[in-house]
């Protein structure tokens, strides 16, 4: 289990998840 590779993938994808979450929350 390569934790470093997992962390890099998470870092790469996190901004997209965060943006999608904020966009969903702000949709009034």
From Swiss-Prot:
This is Uncharacterized protein YGR174W-A. It comes from Saccharomyces cerevisiae (strain ATCC 204508 / S288c) (Baker's yeast).
